[in-house]
Amino acid sequence: MQASIESTGNLERRLTFTLPQERLETHVGGRLRELARTTRIKGFRPGKVPTKVIEQRFGQQVRAEAMEGLLRETFDSAVREHSLRLAGNPRIDQGETDFDFVATFEVVPDFGDIDVTTLSVVRATAEVTDADIDQMIENLRLQRRIWNPVERGAQAGDLVALETWSQAGDERLPADGVETGSSVLGSGVMFDQIEKGLEGLTKGEEKTLSVDFPAEWRVPQLAGKTVQVHVKAVEVSEPVLPAVDKEFIKSFGVKSGDAEQFRADIRTNLERELKGALMNRLRREVGEQLIAAYAHVEMPPRLVENEARSMLAQQVEQVRRSGRDPGQVPADAHQGFMDAAAKRVLVGLLVGEVARRNELRLESRRVSDTLRLIASTYEEPEQVIEMYRNDPQLMNGLQSRVMKEQVIDWIAERAQHTEQSLSFQDAIRV
């Protein structure tokens, strides 16, 4: 195989290689003969279709498939021959002839000696207590609450239906009429000064509040200004929570309505949530330590840019899913994600290097356990497991996640670490 490599940048390489034409022709010929034996074409007996007919009908497709397979195989072989470790996917262009190709790609930087024993990691620990279960049951009751109108003044926990309009200098918002909405006092949904101003209001009562909006406020006409906000309490309602009886318990999938089973199910769910939260904390902690230790290492520019664009796309999609219009996204919007992307790429490449150098292998048992854990959050766990097993893309994503968790654990076990005991609520807080 003819192949040559040249450096076109600190981390960019250009690989020029030639496909072995005789291998391509051999593969194409063999595939066409196989099709001649197995293909049924009207007017010809099975296995007696002339080669010329087979070539006219399938030749172009067979050649394209063979070329694609041989291209991938030849490139991979050249990469192994030159001991290259790619960072991201290559761009492969046609060379001077149909069999010449030029691949441009970035390589993994040299991290030198990766000594994880010098890292200092804080490993958080926590457990689910009866008080956490009680709090979750209270949260479930709040989800099922109903509202009863009251004549007294609004207080914390009440739902206040509102009509509002604002005066910012010479500008009235809205220009005509009022805006309607509602807020539960103490929920923090509304601006703090407005929410505090609603306390004590009775049905039909009006009030004008002087509100100082911060410069970064989401409404440009109000940002950085002292605004007169006129509010009217259309209605004040207090919450009525359901009793924790059999019917309430059954509504959450516990068919027996048994209180102890209900608490056991809640504990299982909270422990699953806690396990994920502690892993995320550990992953973040290890990542921060790796970034601090290897921030001096140059990252592949194109890989970082691609990661930044991916992060931007995820944010735009989140905005769209929330029902908001992301608007026109500037061509250079990804620049705001470049620092975060560089850190993410650094951690990803380092984790891969640690796995490679220490010959860490994916644990199939851990993959199965993680899959069962994911499936247990759905009503039909077995269907979810089957869906993953029949979808290579889903399984690849799961395996990548598990492999990263394995490496993070491996690093944390060998790093200098101290334990930090947290409450359940603190542990799951982002």
Swiss-Prot record:
Its EC number is 5.2.1.8. It is found in: Cytoplasm. SUPFAM superfamilies: FKBP-like (SSF54534), Triger factor/SurA peptide-binding domain-like (SSF109998), Trigger factor ribosome-binding domain (SSF102735). Residues 157-242 form the PPIase FKBP-type domain. GO terms for cellular component: cytoplasm. GO terms for molecular function: peptidyl-prolyl cis-trans isomerase activity; protein folding chaperone; ribosome binding. It catalyses: [protein]-peptidylproline (omega=180) = [protein]-peptidylproline (omega=0). One of its GO terms (biological process) is protein unfolding. NCBIfam families: tig. Consists of 3 domains; the N-terminus binds the ribosome, the middle domain has PPIase activity, while the C-terminus has intrinsic chaperone activity on its own. PANTHER family: TRIGGER FACTOR CHAPERONE AND PEPTIDYL-PROLYL CIS/TRANS ISOMERASE, TRIGGER FACTOR-LIKE PROTEIN TIG, CHLOROPLASTIC. Belongs to the FKBP-type PPIase family. Tig subfamily. This is Trigger factor. It comes from Xanthomonas oryzae pv. oryzae (strain MAFF 311018).
